[in-house]
Amino acid sequence: MRKSKAETAETRRRIVEVAAEAFRANGIHATGLADVMAAAGLSHGGFYRHFESKDQLVAEACEAGTVSILESLENAAGASVGAEGLRAVVDAYLSSAHRDAPGAGCPLAGMGSELARGDEGTRAAASRSVEALVTLLASRTGDPQEKANRSQAVFALSAMIGALTVARILNDPEASDALLSDVRQQIEAIAPIEPIEPI
């Protein structure tokens, strides 16, 4: 019996969701398509009915992971802007909860080095993720298109991704917590002193 378009779309969404978590938690190359399909409750043979390649799935999983982390950071910041808004985003990103849940975290921290070695479509998806996170950070400190705000946001995002990655590497929990705290403080030191008025 053929599936309806809605059922097919739901199956595809489920595959992307499972892959996004698995790729972030375990790495792209360590996660086989058979693993993804089994976790989604599907047979391995059905993969190519939905995707042309693993690379296509990686790109879509990166985009899905980005939507998820953006929602999480937006919820953490609420309506806060200026220094308070930037602080809320940075605190949520560089939290022990984010560090300890890589499968639900930022795809750039969870898959970054593998995304950099991906095909053109994968790197394009990752580039859109970078742009979305830079825009989020820049919008918390003023006009997201203003060069100074974007430069500050690029610096902050780069530091955040690096710090989260290193914090996950460290096997000493106290050192990992201290690293997250130190980088939070350094990023927050560059935030604007006076909050801006909401638009």
Indicate residue ranges for each PLM-predicted region.
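N-terminal intrinsically disordered/low-complexity leader segments
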Residues: 1-10, 194-199
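Helix-turn-helix
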Residues: 14, 18-56, 60
